[in-house]
Amino acid sequence: MAKEFSRTRRIAQQLQQELAVVLQRDMKDPRIGFVTVNDVDVSRDLSYAKVFVTFFEEDKELVQEKLNALITAAPYIRTLVAGRMKLRVMPEIRFVYDSSLVEGMRMSNLVSQVINSDKAKQQQFGSAEDVTSNDIDEADDTEGKA
């Protein structure tokens, strides 16, 4: 029977939890601020861990500054996490900004704008409920004759 969870996935989940705790409680660097650890991908040989993070900042310069602070502090963070996890080899941590949350919010705003635009047009030209199936049939008949 195949394993339900691979070892790398279990380690990635534990690493994600431990990183979240360390970044929240143990990091005193004011440049970093509030960080959310979205996901962790661990290489098969457990030598590297790609950590996907997001910040509450939308300004690209501030995001890059915070990411650089995390990258600079990565060896220290690795040491803190290694003390909390029982691994023979602690993966080298590489922080990556995860823009999927920001992109998701942007897409959601675009969809909301389109829906509001459609509602405004519907109110301006009359609701779709005013159009009956007879009107649609008549429109189809006139198109066929032309």
From Swiss-Prot:
Gene Ontology CC annotations of this record? cytosol
Q: Where does the UniProt entry say this protein principally localizes?
A: cytoplasm
Cellular localization per UniProt: Cytoplasm
- Give a yes or no for keyword Cytoplasm in this entry: yes
Give start-end positions of Polar residues composition bias: 122-134
Stated family: Belongs to the RbfA family.
HAMAP family linked: RbfA
Protein name (record): Ribosome-binding factor A
Q: What's the gene?
A: rbfA
